UniProtKB/Swiss-Prot annotation:
Primary gene name: phhB
Protein name according to UniProt: Pterin-4-alpha-carbinolamine dehydratase
HAMAP family reported in the protein's UniProt record: Pterin_4_alpha
Role summary: Involved in tetrahydrobiopterin biosynthesis. Seems to both prevent the formation of 7-pterins and accelerate the formation of quinonoid-BH2. May also have a positive regulatory role in the expression of phhA.
GO molecular function list: 4-alpha-hydroxytetrahydrobiopterin dehydratase activity
Top-level lineage group: Bacteria
EC number: 4.2.1.96
InterPro entries: PCD_sf (IPR036428), Pterin-4-alpha-carb_dehyd (IPR050376), Pterin_deHydtase (IPR001533)
Amino acid sequence: MSTLNQAHCEACSAGAPQVSEAELPELLRQIPDWNIEVRDSVMQLEKVFLFKNFKFALAFTNAVGEIAEAEGHHPGLLTEWGKVTVTWWSHSIKGLHRNDFIMAARTDEVAAKAEGRK
């Protein structure tokens, strides 16, 4: 189990450092099954979660929204029938910060308790 899910996000402003190439492999090991996607030259973490129906997918989306609000760090969320795509990145630094890995780990924790997973 990752210790990332027990950490808290820190304030991240435009001058904050992105995760370094050296830190990236170790952080990724702590959040298996998350993928790095690059969109508009911005590195992002992304994972798809599958559910039995829309109701369960929506409940998971709302649960992720609650942890995002609590930490003041918000993902991209695409909720579809039986599927939620969660994307974490730090808008202010146009890339990945440790906060994104913390929140990915927290998302996995929410998913482990979510009803209706496939």
